[in-house]
């Protein structure tokens, strides 16, 4: 059977190991060809091809549930569940999503883009099955990176406590080291340790010992020690197995995650076990593509690249430095002058640019794993005792630490500097990764300063502001991708005064107040509006909090019409902040808020999304003209 002939994953149940092996190669070929053309997550999916095929051969996917953590690993799943023909549209506008999405396929029983959610979701599904008396297998597949997340550990702790709830957790361990005892001996020991007859003998023996008059109670502790000794002896293949057994799971593994025969045998055996089962599979990230196997970090995810060389396809023209790069270079320079600066990331050193900080200041760099809550509170502790912590976290991931920002940082006025990369729409990764809520969820927190630069040069200045500000927490948000090409300084940056905006263009018909990435498009929109006789003042707000009301309120009162523009949600966002300030100042003037409506933004290229959302110069000008069309420009001023 060819992959193109597969119309339903249950067809895998009738295939031999050799037939599955041929499908595995076809999946890898399609995976590589597609990601090379569209970009996307490369290494994770290549590493789970055999695991996916073997698991699905042992399941009935019309009935059973498979929950993939994050979705990085799920490209083979997409190909096996009716999406092979459309796989070339991966991460493209109106095409397949880069992550799992319940609305995309009935086989996507759980959607995710943030890590560590799979075990909790799968446990909920297992409990729902039991409540309804259904016959259904539930499996969660989680990577070793996602297992560092506190939510995953919380779920393991709970699931292990529910000894009668059958749930399989598969650890896709794609670390480069592989335990020596992978293979037949491990399979044999798994069978020996979990054999139903032996389990019954052990239970009977314990009962009989405890029932011996007088002696029984004293024997029981000895028997517990005997059980522990046996458990540790039969678990020599993995120290981690002891931990999962103590949590209440039956531990199987580690097994070779690329040996189809062993995988199928182990999965079939695991399905026969009662209660929660933890299966540890060792895989190779990037399996089958030598370039990715040799550089697993770089090829975790890639933009479009040359399949023959693995090198990224060159841009059609030179681009300015990325905001992330400017952030990293500036932070390193500031840290050279301030030994108290500490860099913190939550498993995203390369994405946030903190890998550059680590190269220079390894002793002042901390990667806490997928643990944003811990990252924020640890930063608070560092700040409490005089350090200058810089927490570089994607905007969408900082949402996970909202309580810690309030409880551990803001209430105590601790000077933690939050640097929010990927603010605004990020592009092809879609709704789970867009950073469109930070202005709304941060500005409501008392004492927290929120900044957004109009370009990369202003980001450098705001980095100085953030380091120097010690009255409480402060945050700066900046987008994915290249800057506008603003001239950069190597050092000697002046800080941006807290709460001070700037007027970039003057006009008498309209006041446009823009923040961050929307400042330059608003300036260009003002030029377009001038062609239609509408003369606009444009203000770079710089701060969502505190607002420069000393500048904004007199301008609004004099001009009489206000437009706010932001790359974020309108509900509760920057425009709402300006509107509140106008109302509090007793200024009742027509106000138009341009931003992202109350909906989740789909996946597409960043420029495509900005066009779709009307956040381009022409889109902003069009929205303003349509708003003014019902009100003459010469209307009386407030």
Curated annotation (Swiss-Prot):
Keyword Metal-binding: yes
Domain of life: Bacteria
Binding site residues for Mg(2+): 144, 174
Cofactor notes: Binds 1 Mg(2+) ion per subunit.
PROSITE patterns registered for this protein in UniProt: TRANSKETOLASE_1 (PS00801), TRANSKETOLASE_2 (PS00802)
Enzyme Commission (EC) number: 2.2.1.7
SUPFAM superfamilies found in the cross-reference section: Thiamin diphosphate-binding fold (THDP-binding) (SSF52518), TK C-terminal domain-like (SSF52922)
MF-aspect GO terms: 1-deoxy-D-xylulose-5-phosphate synthase activity; magnesium ion binding; thiamine pyrophosphate binding
Cofactor(s) for this UniProt protein: Mg(2+); thiamine diphosphate
Swiss-Prot/TrEMBL GO biological process terms: 1-deoxy-D-xylulose 5-phosphate biosynthetic process; isopentenyl diphosphate biosynthetic process, methylerythritol 4-phosphate pathway; terpenoid biosynthetic process; thiamine biosynthetic process
Catalytic activity: D-glyceraldehyde 3-phosphate + pyruvate + H(+) = 1-deoxy-D-xylulose 5-phosphate + CO2
Enzyme superclass (EC): transferase
Pfam families in alphabetical order: DXP_synthase_N, Transket_pyr, Transketolase_C
Pathway assignment: Metabolic intermediate biosynthesis; 1-deoxy-D-xylulose 5-phosphate biosynthesis; 1-deoxy-D-xylulose 5-phosphate from D-glyceraldehyde 3-phosphate and pyruvate: step 1/1
InterPro entries from the UniProt entry: Dxylulose-5-P_synthase (IPR005477), THDP-binding (IPR029061), Transketo_C/PFOR_II (IPR009014), Transketolase-like_Pyr-bd (IPR005475), Transketolase_BS (IPR020826), Transketolase_C (IPR033248), Transketolase_CS (IPR049557)
Binding site for thiamine diphosphate: 72, 113-115, 145-146, 174, 289, 372
Keywords of this entry: Isoprene biosynthesis, Magnesium, Metal-binding, Thiamine biosynthesis, Thiamine pyrophosphate, Transferase
GO cellular component: cytosol
Quaternary structure and partners: Homodimer.
Function: Catalyzes the acyloin condensation reaction between C atoms 2 and 3 of pyruvate and glyceraldehyde 3-phosphate to yield 1-deoxy-D-xylulose-5-phosphate (DXP).
Entry similarity comment: Belongs to the transketolase family. DXPS subfamily.
Record protein name field: 1-deoxy-D-xylulose-5-phosphate synthase
Organism name: Gloeobacter violaceus (strain ATCC 29082 / PCC 7421)
Gene: dxs
